[in-house]
């Protein structure tokens, strides 16, 4: 729990700063795409991630490598931000910072990020209907639905929005029924 609180105290200020810069420069999407590309690259190349996170390697050397590799791909604002993360020994949080930045952008656009775990893929019509219900319930202009197929739910789905979980799955109903039986 303490580690989680410490991480959020680190992640939020950096993601807020990046959001503020992106807003001033009107580069929400460019920076979002850059951060996602960088995060994907570091996740897929484990050696590169270890290189960046190793405190024994000189920070200037890390920054030089990042700039050499990404200078033609990433926006200069994004590169400078990543350099700051390296300088402040915060590069290990880049994935979390990127995720929080994306949430701030969506919030600014009055878009709610909704993760949906379902037993099978919903049809386009079902997804649209669910989207309309969620927009009305959470009073927002738009919702961004991210689906994750989880066959163990049997039927129905779970909705994760902000800190809320709405479980309308058969698995959830069975667990609740089991709880009543064992009570």
UniProtKB/Swiss-Prot annotation:
Record's subcellular location: Plastid, Chloroplast thylakoid membrane
Keyword Ion transport set for record: yes
Pfam families tied to this protein: OSCP
NCBIfam families linked: ATP_synt_delta
Organism domain of life: Eukaryota
Function description: F(1)F(0) ATP synthase produces ATP from ADP in the presence of a proton or sodium gradient. F-type ATPases consist of two structural domains, F(1) containing the extramembraneous catalytic core and F(0) containing the membrane proton channel, linked together by a central stalk and a peripheral stalk. During catalysis, ATP synthesis in the catalytic domain of F(1) is coupled via a rotary mechanism of the central stalk subunits to proton translocation. This protein is part of the stalk that links CF(0) to CF(1). It either transmits conformational changes from CF(0) to CF(1) or is implicated in proton conduction.
Keyword annotations of the record: ATP synthesis, CF(1), Chloroplast, Hydrogen ion transport, Ion transport, Membrane, Plastid, Thylakoid, Transport
Membrane topology summary: Peripheral membrane protein
Main localization (coarse): plastid
Coiled coil: none
Protein's recorded name: ATP synthase subunit delta, chloroplastic
